[in-house]
């Protein structure tokens, strides 16, 4: 009698442990897969673009549409190449394993722009003049963001309306926007 009771309790504890692990894995998967949707539905400061930041940071989990001249790379960081017919290329990248999460946009005029975790412009470099630093205050940020969204906004558009089966907006807000 004691032996069967111990075995029964052990089996129940094992099943509960497995269910707890699966639930935690699902929560993490849900937050990453639907991160663009969740980021779109939070209040954020003007000049920040959390939808694009989440699309880049979670590129391995979100839907990536197959588009002509678009190439995705995810070996160590996430990089998207958009090549035009005249072989000019714009690149956007994210390195989630870096200590400070940075997003970098390289345009075909040999300028690179560096953004913080909320996708707010911090600084830039102009490699056509020898890596001179560009002050963020001198950049036409509306035109820059418009250019970025023209080239890479399809990622946000493809994921912003993908609603999760279980809405975990509160958990997303706790994790990313404390």
Residue ranges and their predicted role:
Residues 67-178:
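Extracytoplasmic electrostatic interaction patches
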Residues 10-12, 46-48, 162:
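Generic detector of bulky aromatic hydrophobic side chains
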Residues 1-24:
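N-terminal Sec-pathway targeting helices
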Residues 19-102:
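N-terminal export/targeting and maturation segments
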């Amino acid at each position: 009698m004691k032996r069967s009771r111990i075995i029964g309790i052990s089996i129940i504890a094992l099943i509960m442990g497995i269910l707890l692990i699966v639930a935690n894995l699902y929560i993490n998967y849900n937050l990453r897969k639907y991160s663009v949707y969740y980021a779109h539905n939070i209040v954020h400061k003007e000049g920040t673009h959390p939808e694009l930041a989440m699309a880049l940071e979670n590129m391995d989990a979100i839907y990536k549409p197959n588009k002509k001249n678009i190439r995705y790379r995810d070996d160590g960081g996430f990089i998207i190449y958009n090549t035009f017919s005249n072989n000019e290329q714009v690149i956007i990248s994210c390195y989630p394993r870096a200590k400070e999460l940075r997003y970098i946009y390289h345009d075909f005029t040999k300028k690179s722009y560096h953004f913080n975790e909320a996708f707010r412009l911090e600084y830039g470099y102009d490699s056509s003049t020898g890596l001179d630093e560009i002050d963020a205050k001198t950049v036409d940020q509306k035109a820059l963001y418009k250019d970025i969204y023209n080239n890479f906004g399809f990622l946000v558009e493809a994921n912003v309306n993908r609603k999760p089966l279980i809405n975990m907006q509160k958990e997303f807000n706790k994790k990313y926007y404390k």
